[in-house]
């Protein structure tokens, strides 16, 4: 948000010369004893002073980025191993191919977190930053769309239920996610050694498109799922979308979509913040929402593990075992 994002540092010589010039003009124009009260003088200086905000995710936040990345990679890798482990009960989890893609998306996000982290040097290129933002938002968009499909289609996503459905959804969802990342990929780069979104008049259309995409995927999609669930239940039209613990994923990205929309309105001057405190509060919310979104790469594998544990414990007694599982259990029974 303008100078609320980046504080302009003045050299001592510049500060001294500015102070001397101001004092000379003030004294020569009005004299030492002025008719204005001290309160008005201080208020005028405060109003004319630039509004500065402290960035929470600066170089001091590097340990947070690194720790989150490492934990996210380890947790996602563990979940993927359990999902693809032969003859393991998580493969009976409804829609497990979609769940595996969620873990892949979380792992991809965890990998690019250090690329966008501040404090790792000042030699990063714009191409690397654009690639980082592409994977960052692409994996998040794909995870949100996968959750929507998993909630809407439910048990029909199981292996062998509808031939080609899982493959078609995989290609379609990741393709749509890649298209949605084009605006942020083109509107991002390196500035002062940091990966950042570039705000300019020429890129305003790309910024608006990216903001709309975030609002649609992170805000409107979960609201639509909740609305459809409540409407179908109220009208007695069926169970509606399959509600599960996985819906907690949107808690990590919903604030990011909302605050990003507010920030775009302020930058476009469609929403005016008259006080410095309000602008500082918005900057703080942007940092907190980004930090919460980053934490999703650690929370997603935990949500997947909890969902698979609950689903297999509930559905395992009633599900028909695949042929390989039956022979495996028979072998174990004969040995005992």
From Swiss-Prot:
GO biological process, any: chemokine-mediated signaling pathway
Record has Signal as a keyword: no
Disulfide-bonded cysteines: 51-276, 129-195
Transmembrane segments: 64-84, 96-116, 130-153, 167-187, 208-228, 245-265, 288-308
All ranges on the Extracellular side of the membrane: 1-63, 117-129, 188-207, 266-287
Sugar-modified residues: 16, 27, 33
Membrane topology: Multi-pass membrane protein
GO terms for MF: C-C chemokine binding; G protein-coupled receptor activity
InterPro entries per record: Duffy_chemokine_rcpt
One Gene Ontology cellular component: membrane
Cytoplasmic face of the membrane: 85-95, 154-166, 229-244, 309-336
Locations listed in the record: Early endosome; Recycling endosome; Membrane
Keyword terms of this UniProt record: Disulfide bond, Endosome, G-protein coupled receptor, Glycoprotein, Membrane, Receptor, Transducer, Transmembrane, Transmembrane helix
Main location: other
Domain of life per record: Eukaryota
Function: Atypical chemokine receptor that controls chemokine levels and localization via high-affinity chemokine binding that is uncoupled from classic ligand-driven signal transduction cascades, resulting instead in chemokine sequestration, degradation, or transcytosis. Also known as interceptor (internalizing receptor) or chemokine-scavenging receptor or chemokine decoy receptor. Has a promiscuous chemokine-binding profile, interacting with inflammatory chemokines of both the CXC and the CC subfamilies but not with homeostatic chemokines.
Family indicated by similarity: Belongs to the G-protein coupled receptor 1 family. Atypical chemokine receptor subfamily.
Descriptive protein name: Atypical chemokine receptor 1
Phylogenetic placement of the source organism: Eukaryota, Metazoa, Chordata, Craniata, Vertebrata
Gene that specifies this protein: ACKR1
């Amino acid at each position: 948000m303008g100078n609320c994002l980046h504080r302009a540092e003045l050299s001592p010589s510049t500060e001294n010369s500015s102070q001397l010039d101001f004092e000379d003009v003030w004294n020569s124009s009005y004299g030492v004893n002025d008719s204005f009260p001290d309160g008005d003088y201080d208020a005028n200086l405060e109003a004319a002073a630039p509004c500065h905000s402290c960035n929470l995710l600066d170089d001091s936040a590097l340990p947070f980025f690194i720790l989150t990345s490492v934990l996210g990679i380890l947790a996602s890798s563990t979940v993927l191993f359990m999902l693809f482990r032969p003859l393991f009960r998580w493969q009976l989890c409804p829609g497990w191919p979609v769940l595996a893609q969620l873990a892949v998306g979380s792992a991809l996000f965890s990998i690019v977190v250090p690329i966008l982290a501040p404090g790792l040097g000042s030699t990063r290129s714009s191409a690397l930053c654009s690639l980082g933002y592409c994977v960052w938002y692409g994996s998040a968009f794909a995870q949100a769309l996968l959750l929507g499909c998993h909630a809407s289609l439910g048990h029909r996503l199981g292996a062998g239920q509808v031939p080609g459905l899982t493959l078609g959804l995989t290609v379609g969802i990741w393709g749509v996610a890649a298209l949605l990342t084009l605006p942020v990929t083109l509107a991002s780069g390196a500035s002062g050694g940091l990966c950042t979104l570039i705000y300019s008049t020429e890129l305003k259309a790309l910024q608006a498109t990216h903001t709309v995409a975030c609002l649609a995927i992170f805000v409107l999609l979960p609201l639509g799922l909740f609305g459809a669930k409540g409407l179908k239940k109220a009208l007695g039209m069926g169970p509606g979308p399959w509600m599960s613990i996985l819906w907690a994923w949107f808690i990590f990205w919903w604030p990011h979509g909302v605050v990003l929309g507010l920030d775009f309105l302020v930058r476009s001057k469609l929403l005016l913040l008259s006080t410095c405190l309000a602008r500082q509060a918005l900057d703080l919310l942007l940092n907190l929402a980004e930090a919460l979104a980053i934490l999703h790469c650690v929370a997603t594998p935990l949500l997947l593990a909890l969902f698979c544990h609950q689903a297999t414990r509930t559905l395992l007694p009633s599900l028909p075992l695949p042929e390989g599982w039956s022979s495996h259990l028979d072998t174990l029974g004969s040995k005992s």
